[in-house]
């Protein structure tokens, strides 16, 4: 592994040298040094006040490099280094103290040098199809000052101000190490918690994000300012650190008590789903927190529909903005900020503290023993429940400390909430070895460096896809994780049965027939609700698909939205050329293809790792679609042709409605017959006891493959119907919140229950699309016009709490019934 990493860095470095040295091999005449030559640094802003930083390098009266950065929507800086070293033929000349040039398709730069030490200018930036958090069109007015180099003797040789290939490589490494250190900070808590319960905590990302929000809120509440005496600043920040660690520990212990303790020893998937429900609830807490703050920017939450604002208060910059290379008069043309060194040092300090705690303290030794297995730990007298609780408290405290360092480094909180936000931290924890803090640090730094190298030498828009692909490779290569083979949680009940609602024979069939008749009659009685009901029936189809995988086979597919969205995109591109029957077949095949990939993963991974792997697969497919120009990027594809069959276009809303209803009825009937068949009984036997089913002749890998292929095929058919009948597709169809909504529908209706799929999907969609809007309108009419009472409460904004509590309570109540 070490040799592979070393060879990777060497190859990338040689590629960088070959691509940047070649232009300079052309002989050129030496030119006299210009008074404008040197490093320039300045700031600017857009018309709406968005701050930018600008760095220029001038050599021989030519612009040889330009770098700019700004804060993205999630609070993390976006840095454009693509033009940090321009090829010789692309370097614009400064004529009459001015230059204007299109450095690329996404950047137009102009500048006027008022003197030899001051310049102003304008940047026109088109940042698209890279990181969505950075995307946008920006018009930036900036001003910059020339950086005065350290005084040298006249006899010293004059050094070029342009960075050479080696310096460029080192600069990228520094960016990567600082970003990787931030990732490693979050991974420390992940690895400590996971080592005891061996199930991913999907709410950990929300704990970390809320701790960063607490840090910025408390700093602003106390009013800590840069002009305070140093000891007073240090004392105030130390108090904030203690509060952040306390909040992190408290939230993390709460997650353990509510999401892990009730299911201990019974199921792997139940706590995973429960933490997803708590992720919804914690995000709702972030929204409530926001209402008490005076400023914020749009944030992200990947687990729920919509992207409302989350707490993102800015704070003063307490870390000195100095370049240590210039301050120490080092002979290198690179930038090493004090803040970069600070975050790397603090990551090392926290990792060392965690390693010392695990090796020297009684609790740490108990956690290490527990990571090897619960039964062995109990045999040597360890209190399992108490040790797990302490591990969560420790992991939460480290999440609070990491949140404190993150907020100081970026001067604002982490803006990405939800289950996805902790995914890359889990990659670092898995790569470094579960329960190994130093491994989490090294892998976090490695991921940061690989990301920076990919941003510069490849393309930034593919970096997230590269990291997600890395996670998939890690899972298939080392299914049990690196550095830990212990099984801390032993399941005694099959994963799907704990989520299954009790069936009642003929009563269930009667309800199923009643629902189909009602869906067929409602458009004739009330045509106005056809669009909402058609939307609900598409989600019924998706719920039927996930029901096959989760409710019957016990495999949680958190990437089912990828099959849905990919088939929708294929339909949008080809529906005008093929009839609806052909497109339904193609959509099913597209979904089935992703099902084959999931089936391969299922053959190598246990249930909870499989869930995380499918989550990563869904995000990977979405990122690839965003990066493809013909797919429309973030804007999607509109104006999709209406479905047609035998030269008859189904243009009317009623025609589209009954088309979807017929497909849903056929899918429900087929699903019911399949579950009752020999194949369905084999799936149920497999999920109840894999070893017993295998001894009876059930092919484990083949059975899971068939289940996941059929599940994804149904999702593909749903995607085709969505694109054909709603005439628009977008990347958010493949977003994680769609998979989460489908999961909620399955759990609410009862996993393994065809009628439950109808009930769950109809309940969620009608609540979200019909009941809540009407209730909000009614509340606005009756709400008193009284300033003391306040404005009308936004009950639509409470949807996240409602989804989370439904998901959590349904899993909890059914788990208790099974016990």
For the regions a language model picked out, list residue spans one by one.
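C-terminal motif of bacterial Sec signal peptides marking the signal peptidase cleavage site
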Residues: 13-16
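Bacterial signal peptide processing site
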Residues: 18-20
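N-terminal glycine/threonine-rich, aromatic-flanked beta-hairpin/loop signature
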Residues: 46-94, 120-122
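Short, hydrophobic transmembrane alpha-helix segments
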Residues: 166-167, 191-200, 221-226, 231-238, ...
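Transmembrane alpha-helices
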Residues: 181-188, 378, 383-406, 419, ...
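Transmembrane alpha-helices and adjacent helix-loop boundaries
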Residues: 205, 239, 265-319, 324-327, ...
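Mid-bilayer segments of alpha-helical transmembrane spans in multi-pass integral membrane proteins
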Residues: 245-250, 275-292, 340, 352-353, ...
């Amino acid at each position: 592994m070490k040799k592979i990493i070393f060879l990777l860095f060497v190859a990338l470095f040689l590629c960088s040298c070959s691509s940047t040295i070649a232009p300079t091999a052309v002989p050129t005449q030496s030119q006299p040094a210009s008074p404008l030559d040197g490093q320039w640094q300045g700031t600017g802003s857009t018309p709406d006040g968005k701050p930018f930083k600008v760095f220029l390098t001038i050599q021989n009266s030519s612009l040889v490099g330009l770098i700019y950065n700004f804060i993205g929507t999630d609070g993390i800086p976006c840095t454009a280094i693509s033009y940090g070293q321009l090829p010789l033929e692309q370097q614009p000349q400064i004529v009459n103290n001015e230059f204007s040039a299109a450095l690329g398709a996404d950047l137009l730069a102009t500048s006027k040098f008022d003197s030899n030490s001051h310049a102003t200018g304008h940047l026109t930036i088109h940042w698209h199809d890279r990181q969505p958090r950075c995307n946008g069109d920006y018009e930036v007015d900036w001003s910059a000052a020339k950086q005065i180099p350290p005084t040298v003797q006249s006899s010293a040789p004059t050094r070029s101000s342009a960075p050479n290939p080696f310096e460029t490589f080192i600069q990228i490494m520094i960016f990567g190490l600082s970003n990787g250190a931030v990732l490693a900070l979050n991974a420390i808590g992940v690895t400590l918690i996971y080592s005891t319960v061996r199930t991913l905590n999907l709410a950990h990302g929300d704990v970390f994000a809320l701790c960063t929000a607490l840090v910025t809120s408390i700093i602003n509440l106390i009013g800590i300012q840069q002009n305070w005496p140093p000891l007073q600043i240090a004392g105030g920040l130390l108090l904030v650190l203690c509060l952040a660690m306390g909040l992190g520990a408290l939230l993390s212990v709460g997650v353990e008590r509510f999401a892990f303790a009730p299911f201990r020893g019974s199921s792997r998937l139940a706590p995973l789903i429960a933490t997803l429900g708590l992720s919804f609830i914690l995000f709702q807490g972030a929204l409530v927190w926001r209402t008490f703050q005076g400023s914020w920017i749009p944030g992200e939450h990947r687990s729920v529909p919509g992207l409302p604002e989350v707490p993102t208060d800015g704070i003063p910059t307490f870390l000195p903005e100095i370049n240590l290379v210039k301050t120490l008069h080092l002979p290198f043309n690179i930038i090493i900020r004090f803040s970069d060194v600070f975050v790397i040092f603090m990551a090392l300090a926290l990792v060392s503290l965690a390693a010392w705690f695990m090796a020297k303290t009684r609790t740490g030794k108990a956690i290490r023993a527990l990571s090897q297995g619960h039964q062995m730990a109990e045999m040597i007298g360890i209190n399992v429940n108490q040790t797990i609780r302490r591990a969560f408290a420790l992991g939460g405290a480290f999440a609070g400390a990491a949140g404190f360092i993150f907020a100081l480094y970026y001067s604002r909180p982490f803006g990405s909430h939800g289950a996805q936000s902790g995914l890359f931290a889990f990659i670092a924890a898995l790569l470094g070895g579960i329960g190994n803090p130093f491994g989490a640090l090294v892998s976090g730094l490695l991921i940061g460096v690989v990301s920076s190298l990919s941003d510069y030498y490849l393309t930034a828009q593919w970096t997230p896809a590269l990291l997600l692909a890395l996670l998939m490779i890690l899972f298939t290569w080392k299914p049990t994780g690196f550095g830990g083979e212990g099984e801390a949680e032993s399941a005694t009940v099959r994963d799907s049965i704990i989520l299954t609602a009790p069936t009642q024979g003929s009563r269930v069939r009667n309800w199923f027939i009643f629902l189909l008749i009602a869906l067929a009659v409602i458009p004739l009685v009330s045509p106005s609700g056809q669009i909402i009901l058609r939307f609900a029936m598409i989600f019924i189809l998706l719920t039927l698909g996930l029901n096959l995988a989760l409710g019957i086979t016990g495999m949680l597919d958190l990437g089912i939205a990828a099959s849905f969205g990919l088939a929708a995109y294929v339909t949008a591109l080809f529906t005008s050329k093929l009839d609806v029957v052909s497109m339904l077949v193609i959509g099913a095949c597209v979904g089935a293809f992703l099902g084959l990939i999931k089936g391969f993963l299922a053959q190598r991974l246990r249930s909870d790792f499989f869930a995380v792997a499918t989550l990563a697969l869904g995000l990977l497919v979405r990122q690839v679609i965003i990066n493809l120009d013909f797919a429309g990027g973030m804007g999607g594809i509109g104006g999709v042709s209406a479905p047609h069959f035998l030269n008859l276009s189904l243009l009317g809303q009623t025609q589209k409605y009954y088309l979807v209803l017929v497909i849903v009825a056929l899918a429900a009937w087929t699903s019911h017959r399949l579950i009752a068949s020999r194949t369905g009984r084999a799936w149920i036997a497999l999920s109840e006891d894999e070893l017993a089913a295998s001894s009876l002749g059930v092919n484990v890998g083949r059975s899971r493959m068939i289940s996941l292929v059929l599940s994804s095929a149904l999702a593909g058919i749903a995607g085709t119907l969505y694109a054909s009948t709603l005439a628009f597709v977008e990347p958010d169809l493949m977003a994680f919140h769609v998979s989460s909504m489908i999961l909620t529908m399955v759990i609410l209706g009862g996993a393994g229950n065809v009628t439950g799929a109808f009930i769950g999907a109809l309940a969620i969609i009608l609540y979200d699309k019909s009941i809540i809007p009407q209730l909000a309108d009614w509340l606005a009419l009756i709400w008193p016009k009284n300033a003391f009472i306040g404005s009308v409460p936004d009950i639509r904004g409470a949807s996240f709490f409602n989804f989370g509590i439904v998901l959590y309570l349904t899993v909890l109540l059914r788990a208790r019934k099974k016990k």
